[in-house]
Swiss-Prot record:
Subcellular location: Vacuole membrane
Domain free text: Aquaporins contain two tandem repeats each containing three membrane-spanning domains and a pore-forming loop with the signature motif Asn-Pro-Ala (NPA).
Taxonomic lineage of the native organism: Eukaryota, Viridiplantae, Streptophyta, Embryophyta, Tracheophyta
GO (cellular component) term, any one: vacuolar membrane
Membrane topology: Multi-pass membrane protein
Leader peptide range in chain numbering: none
Transmembrane regions listed in the UniProt entry: 20-40, 52-72, 101-121, 142-162, 167-187, 215-235
Protein name: Probable aquaporin TIP4-3
Keywords of this entry: Membrane, Repeat, Transmembrane, Transmembrane helix, Transport, Vacuole
Length: 251
């Protein structure tokens, strides 16, 4: 099983690391601008995420923008756009904890800038929507929902992007985006289906609403690293291991 790598402060001056951090800031900005913007547009057009059509539109927008941004950043920073993804990959030894902290700071800044810009561009006509559990959904259930949804997301990231034995290639980011969209359809009416502390942080900052914000840190930061540990421990296989060859007729 992979071990955590602490890293070193010298990473902060490494040109490759700096490019990756700037990429995470920009990619997260663009992701949150489209994702939150789609939720604001759905609310403006009527119903928002409280209707099946609004929820489907928001889920589709998130799925598409996640797929594109992960693909765009894959060979620069990994296209994390999410502190839970970053920590989940750190749990598997794929990124140092020091670089993870730099990524998370960039992701939070990108999300904040996106939401502040959205608030300015819309002139306050539509409030920036903040993640919160639905009425009747307690904090514990919301945390559990976010943990499960984020586990699903990270499991997909490992299986389709990280695990080099899988012949997925360029389809990996698209499949990750589809999981995000499906999870929003499944969990949106209950916890909001954030799966991403940065995605929740920007709107909370722009709206000044922090009452339930902790849920969207605790749940994803449980589910993400847990998925990394499970996939690394059970599915990655020892170094140098190659899966058995398959025939076309095999299941």
């Amino acid at each position: 099983m992979a071990k955590l790598a602490l890293g070193h402060h010298r990473e902060a001056t490494d040109p490759g690391c700096l490019r990756a951090v700037v990429a995470e800031l920009l990619l997260t900005f663009l992701f949150v601008f489209s994702g939150v913007g789609s939720a604001m547009a759905a609310a403006k057009l009527g119903g928002g995420g409280d209707t099946i059509m609004g929820l489907t539109a928001v889920a589709a927008a998130h799925a598409l923008v996640v797929a594109v941004m992960v693909s765009a950043g894959l060979h620069v920073s990994g296209g994390h756009i999410n502190p839970a993804v970053t920590l989940g990959l750190a749990a598997g030894g794929h990124i140092t904890l020091f670089r993870s902290a730099l990524y998370a700071a960039a992701q939070l800044l990108g999300s904040s800038l996106a939401c502040l810009l959205l608030a300015a561009l819309t002139g306050g006509e539509e409030a920036v929507p903040v993640h919160a559990p639905a009425p009747g959904v307690g904090a514990a259930r919301a945390v559990a929902m976010e943990a499960v949804l984020t586990f699903s997301l990270l499991f997909a990231v490992y299986a389709t992007v990280v695990d080099r034995r899988r012949a997925v290639g360029a389809l990996g980011p698209l499949l990750v985006g589809l999981v995000v969209g499906a999870n929003i359809l499944a969990g949106g009416p209950y916890s909001g289906a954030s799966m991403n502390p940065a995605r929740s942080f920007g709107p909370a900052l722009a709206a000044g609403e922090w009452a339930d914000h902790w849920i969207y840190w605790v749940g994803p930061l449980i589910g993400g690293p847990l998925a990394g540990l499970v996939y690394e421990g059970l599915f990655m296989g020892p170094p140098g291991h190659e899966p058995l060859p398959r025939n076309d007729g095999d299941f």
